[in-house]
């Protein structure tokens, strides 16, 4: 592993030299390419250099202890210092193993999140709205930007479906494990007998797809326009501003009506369409690695029940990793890092196990 790290540091140094080369400075494309690669190696190189510095301090301390035969205070200090440095080296080494794990190429991307009310009628729609609020609050905490792409509200409040975009650094890496069925157990406000109801909502987190990743032939699209509707299906405007796009080869249908302009709705719908088709392609790839996926944190299967939100007990349980927290209120206010970090840590541990690290 240390040989690999040495090679990475060498490449990092090469890139620094290339980026200061006048020929590269005058070529924006090359400069962008090298800068991106340089940035991707920075964290691991800094950690490796920290490891080398600590190792040197450790070896020097050991040498000083061997040579010291006159100063009892120094001897006592070194006997404390050597195990401390050894533990620090091990911690840095373990961090390096995680940094060397294969990266998901989509981790840095923006995401499109789709939340759909499942079983449970009006209560499921209200829960879908709670999840939407939870993710948008989390986006605020992370300084990410959110934008609604399409939404269908219910008469009683809540959403039958809401599709929104989250733009920000590493959005996909933090949110990708949210895909699946979320279940809520609570007493609805309309329930006079105090009986607990169970409802569900399905979440899909799709990485935003670039034009270069997914080429869509416009001849394979059917585009329909219609009047936007509000809760209960009533028309909310008289112009044909809402857009429905059907990708005929895959049967994927996307509609968007949140903007007043047909052009803007079409742009948003195309973003969602591209992400859905890209997601289908990724799912096919994952199915080819089915055996590998069995041991990973959830299969990403949208029908898999991943989490239960139990209101009477103020408890949230993530079923994939048997993780429970009693911070229900805080989680619904967007404080979901505890859940996300637990999922990422489990995934990393499984990857390390597979690699025999």
From Swiss-Prot:
Sections of the chain in a coiled coil: none
One Pfam family, short name: RF-1
Compositionally biased spans, kind Basic and acidic residues: 290-307
Post-translational modification: Methylated by PrmC. Methylation increases the termination efficiency of RF1.
Single GO molecular function: translation release factor activity, codon specific
Subcellular localization, as worded in the UniProt entry: Cytoplasm
Gene3D superfamilies per record: 3.30.160.20, 3.30.70.1660, 6.10.140.1950
Protein's UniProt keywords contain Protein biosynthesis: yes
InterPro entries xrefs: PCRF, Pep_chain_release_fac_I, Pep_chain_release_fac_I_sf, Prokaryotic/Mito_RF, RF-1
GO CC annotation: cytoplasm
Residue numbers bearing the N5-methylglutamine modification: 234
Record-linked SUPFAM superfamilies: Release factor
Protein keywords: Cytoplasm, Methylation, Protein biosynthesis
Start and end residues of each stretch annotated as Disordered: 286-311
Protein's UniProt keywords contain Protein biosynthesis: yes
Role this protein plays: Peptide chain release factor 1 directs the termination of translation in response to the peptide chain termination codons UAG and UAA.
Family classification: Belongs to the prokaryotic/mitochondrial release factor family.
Name recorded for this polypeptide: Peptide chain release factor 1
Gene (UniProt): prfA
């Amino acid at each position: 592993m240390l040989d690999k790290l040495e090679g990475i540091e060498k490449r990092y140094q090469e890139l620094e030299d290339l980026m200061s080369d006048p020929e590269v400075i005058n070529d924006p494309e090359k400069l962008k390419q090298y800068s991106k690669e340089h940035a991707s190696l920075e964290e691991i190189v800094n950690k490796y250099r920290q490891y080398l510095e600590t190792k040197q301090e450790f070896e020097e301390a050991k040498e000083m202890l061997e040579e010291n035969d006159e100063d009892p205070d120094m001897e006592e200090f070194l006997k404390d210092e050597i195990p401390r440095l050894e533990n620090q080296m091990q911690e840095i080494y373990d961090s390096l193993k995680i940094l060397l794990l294969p990266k998901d190429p989509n981790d840095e991307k923006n995401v499109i999140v789709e939340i759909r009310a499942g079983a449970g009628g009006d209560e499921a729609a209200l829960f879908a709205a709670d999840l939407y609020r939870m993710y948008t609050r989390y986006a605020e905490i992370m300084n990410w930007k959110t934008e609604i792409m399409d939404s269908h509200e219910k008469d009683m409040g809540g959403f039958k479906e809401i599709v929104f975009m989250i733009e920000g650094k590493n959005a996909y890496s933090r949110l990708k494990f949210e895909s699946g069925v979320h279940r809520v157990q609570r007493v609805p406000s309309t329930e006079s007998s105090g009986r607990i109801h169970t409802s569900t909502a399905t979440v899909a987190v799709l990485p935003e797809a670039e034009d270069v990743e997914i080429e869509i032939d416009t001849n394979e699209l059917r585009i329909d326009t219609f009047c936007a509707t509000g809760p209960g299906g009533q028309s909310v405007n008289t112009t044909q501003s809402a857009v429905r796009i059907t990708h005929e080869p895959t049967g994927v249908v996307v509609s968007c009506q949140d903007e007043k302009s047909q052009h803007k709705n079409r742009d948003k719908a195309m973003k969602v369409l591209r992400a859905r088709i890209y997601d289908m392609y990724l799912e096919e790839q994952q199915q080819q690695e089915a055996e590998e996926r069995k041991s990973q944190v959830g299969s990403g299967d949208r029908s898999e029940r991943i989490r239960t939100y139990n209101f009477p007990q103020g408890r949230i349980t993530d079923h994939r990793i048997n993780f429970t927290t009693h911070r229900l209120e805080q989680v619904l206010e967007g404080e979901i890092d505890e859940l996300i970090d637990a999922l990422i840590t489990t995934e990393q541990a499984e990857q390390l196990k597979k690699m025999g690290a």
